[in-house]
Amino acid sequence: MRPSEQRQLASIRAELSRLIRYDDESIVHDTWARQRYDCGCFPGLMAARGATVAAAWHEAGHAVAALDVGAHFSSASIHHGCTAEGRVHGISGAGDLAFVIDAAGQIAERLMRWTMLERDDDLRAWLATWRGDGGDARRFRRALGPRFGGDELRAWRYSEQRLVPLRLRIARVARALLVHPRYLPYNVVLEIAAHDPAQRRGP
């Protein structure tokens, strides 16, 4: 980890520690909320903050999934643009598990809201409507071949099985994205995802 990344990590950890008792919407950095409000995309700052939180969980899902399957990426960001609410940049090395990363944004948003689709019929109906999403839907379906062929349902359930146990890691990365007004490099995301501040070291 470069010295600049070490400083960035220390700053983020200090800010997260200071804001530990606050909910996600309360810790959104003004930079991210203003981006979404000033462009006229949302009627007020409250709505802009809510959208920022959803974007942070979405991108954190992609990032943590990439770490879980052994892929690499350059950085994660929730910078608001014309076509995307954020992005995990330069993902590589996912192999035949790339579809897990593609599904992870939507799965993370459902983990945030505790709205997982438990019935297969409900999930199958939702998958039939899933289009666009910054290219996630297209990439997910394109990557299924090596493991699941065209069976989207089985691939999605497999992705859930890998990601649901990682909810707390996703939450930590999401909160880091919310409090920091710039992109997070790979090494910083790796450290934040791995470090649980609730775990105390032994004597």
Q: Where are the regions a protein language model picked out?
A:
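Soluble catalytic regions of large protease machineries
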Residues: 2-203
